């Protein structure tokens, strides 16, 4: 068997869906699904942009190390 390759399989599936949910409820479900997908894509895009704008943690650690080393050198020179 080839699965759902026949048009009649799809017709039966659609009839079952209409019987389960009703003709009025299907557009509401589709609208909700579409808005959910849209919100998900927007959230993924926002997270990607946020990740690009964040400073790298390695760079921040290197800067802190340089500041610490510089302050140690100054304190030794003053002593």
Curated annotation (Swiss-Prot):
According to the record, the residues making up region (Disordered) are 46-79
Q: Which UniProt keywords apply?
A: Cell inner membrane, Cell membrane, Membrane, Protein transport, Translocation, Transmembrane, Transmembrane helix, Transport
What does the entry give for GO biological process?
Answer: protein transport by the Tat complex
Q: Listed GO molecular functions?
A: protein transmembrane transporter activity
- Membrane topology classification: Single-pass membrane protein
List residues traversing the bilayer.
Answer: 1-21
Supply the Pfam families for this chain. TatA_B_E
Bias regions of kind Basic and acidic residues — which residues? 66-79
Q: Where is the protein found, in the record's own terms?
A: Cell inner membrane
Its main subcellular localisation, reduced to a broad class, is membrane
InterPro entries documented for this protein: TatA/B/E, TatA/E
The answer to whether UniProt assigns keyword Transmembrane to this entry is yes
Q: Which domain of life is it from?
A: Bacteria
Query: Which cellular component terms (GO) are annotated to the entry?
Result: TAT protein transport complex
Under the heading HAMAP family, the entry gives: TatA_E
Q: What does this protein do?
A: Part of the twin-arginine translocation (Tat) system that transports large folded proteins containing a characteristic twin-arginine motif in their signal peptide across membranes. TatA could form the protein-conducting channel of the Tat system.
Q: Tell me the PANTHER family matching this sequence.
A: SEC-INDEPENDENT PROTEIN TRANSLOCASE PROTEIN TATA
- NCBIfam families found in the cross-reference section: tatAE
**Quaternary organization:** The Tat system comprises two distinct complexes: a TatABC complex, containing multiple copies of TatA, TatB and TatC subunits, and a separate TatA complex, containing only TatA subunits. Substrates initially bind to the TatABC complex, which probably triggers association of the separate TatA complex to form the active translocon.
By sequence similarity, the record places it as follows:
Belongs to the TatA/E family.
Q: What is the protein name for this chain?
A: Sec-independent protein translocase protein TatA
Q: Which organism is this entry from?
A: Helicobacter pylori (strain HPAG1)
What lineage is this protein's organism placed in?
Bacteria, Pseudomonadati, Campylobacterota, Epsilonproteobacteria, Campylobacterales
Q: Which gene encodes it?
A: tatA
């Amino acid at each position: 068997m080839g699965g759902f390759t026949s048009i009649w399989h799809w017709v039966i599936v659609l009839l079952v869906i209409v019987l389960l949910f009703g003709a009025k409820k299907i557009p509401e479900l589709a609208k909700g699904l579409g808005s959910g997908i849209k919100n998900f894509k927007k959230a993924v895009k926002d997270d990607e942009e946020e990740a690009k704008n964040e400073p790298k943690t390695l760079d921040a650690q290197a800067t802190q190390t340089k500041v610490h080393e510089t302050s140690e050198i100054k304190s030794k020179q003053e002593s």
